[in-house]
Design a protein with these regions (language model features):
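Compositionally biased, intrinsically disordered low-complexity segments
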Residues: 13, 21, 29, 352, ...
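Active-site-adjacent loops and short helices of periplasmic peptidoglycan-processing enzymes
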Residues: 2-11, 18-201, 205-210, 214
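Hydrophobic alpha-helical segments, especially transmembrane helices
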Residues: 13-14, 95, 276, 381-383
């Protein structure tokens, strides 16, 4: 367990077994990676255990099934655990949806929603409250996606983009371009579907790519917005990113987004980005097993660790450059310019500060949007996620 004496003994035994003494280079065992796990970003990222360079600060205690810490600008991966493990992404997949569709429509464009636009939204979806017959700007629809994780807003934008099927095809193509090879897209909203998976590495790629777009960056950093309620009326929506708003957990200084997610199957997943001292870090945490706040607390702890380690610890891998941005004929999985390769100096050590549970018990609580009367009814509320143990389906 991270921080436990047992993990210390594991690393010590491994070192003794190899006869390498205190300078040993070992990797803590972890859950087996998916059979199709890729080593995009460096050989060490294909391993299932904790990957961190020797001499790095002590890692915090963590319960996530997979996580990753990376420098947004250099692409250096500072530490990871099961980086390529394929897991259900929940609404964090909306980052790929936004990265794919957001550049296609001007934010001031207006769309009058039809019933057909709202067809096929899964029961139990998180909703912002889009109504057929009401006109919305593209900006308002994206606010519904980023702030409230509204699947109704996602489906309207997908309809504008040629339909759900076409949007899924484009998202998969974009994932391929980003070299997010662990990701299989079934729906644009991230809702639970058989075979819909991503990884901590891929979600970090989506966030890194998305944050290059000023609109993407602005939406995920927005705390509140007024959303149309029909006619001239509006109601306020609040971002469900708790590290941004400070709802239920302490807000994180310097946080700039990006996206949280929850389903009853996927558990809690979050990719966050923060800037301090001119350095921007990305952290993805997938499926911690200890309550709905854990995903935020573990993200904050890893951000703190990353800012302490950046510039001091050698990277264990890299966020690769999109294929479309590489010179023609360049090999896939090329590191970013200036980024250290997976074989950089600094041997892996047993991260005795870190332990990982490997069960599928996840906590969560929130209000559930409802389907009724042949239409979509969204509950106006200050926060979809609220403490108290009430089960939620997606957020």
């Amino acid at each position: 367990m991270p921080g436990s004496s047992s993990s210390h003994h594991v690393s010590r035994r491994a070192a003794l077994a190899l006869g390498l003494g205190a300078a040993a280079s070992v990797t803590l065992p972890g859950p087996r990676a998916a059979a199709a796990a890729s080593a995009v970003g460096g050989e060490r990222l294909g391993r299932s255990g904790v990957q961190v360079a020797s001499g790095a600060p002590r890692l915090p205690k963590l319960a996530a099934k997979a996580w990753l810490v990376a420098d947004h600008d250099s692409g250096d991966v500072l530490a990871s655990y099961a980086a390529h493990r394929a897991l259900p992404p929940a609404s964090t997949l909306k980052m790929l949806f936004a990265d794919t569709v957001l550049p296609k429509f001007g934010r001031a464009s207006v769309h009058r929603v039809t019933a057909a636009d709202l067809a096929g939204i899964p029961y139990g979806s998180s909703l912002v409250g889009v109504q057929a017959g009401t006109s919305y700007t593209v900006e308002q629809l994206w606010q519904g996606v980023f702030l409230r994780s509204g699947n109704d807003a996602v489906h309207v934008l997908a309809s504008m983009n040629g339909g759900v099927g076409e949007t899924v095809r484009q998202m998969q193509a974009r994932a391929k371009d980003l070299q997010a090879n662990d990701t299989h897209v079934v729906s644009p909203d991230g809702f639970d579907h058989k075979g819909q998976v991503s990884s901590a590495y891929d979600l970090t790629l989506f966030a890194c790519a998305g944050l290059k777009n000023d609109d993407f960056r602005g939406y995920c950093a927005t705390k509140t917005a007024d959303f149309p309620a029909g006619g001239t009326k509006t109601f306020q929506i609040q971002n469900t990113d708790r590290l941004l708003t400070g709802q239920g957990v302490a807000s994180y200084r310097g946080l700039i987004g990006v996206k949280n997610g929850y389903t009853s199957h996927a558990g809690n997943t979050f990719t966050g980005a923060a800037t301090r001292g001119g350095r921007t870090l990305l952290v993805t945490v997938m499926h911690p097993a200890s309550g709905y706040e854990a995903v935020y607390r573990e993200t904050a702890a890893l951000l703190d660790w990353g800012f302490a380690a950046a510039g001091k610890a050698d990277p264990v891998g890299t966020l690769v450059t999109p294929l479309s941005e590489q010179p023609k004929g360049a090999a896939a999985a090329k590191p970013r310019a200036g980024a250290a390769g997976a074989g950089a100096a600094g041997a892996p050590v047993a991260a005795s500060a870190t332990s990982h549970t490997d069960d599928w018990a996840f906590g969560g609580s929130a209000a559930v949007a409802v389907l009724a009367g042949g239409g979509l009814l969204a509950l106006r509320r200050r926060e979809r996620e609220r403490p108290g143990g009430r089960r939620r389906r997606q957020g």
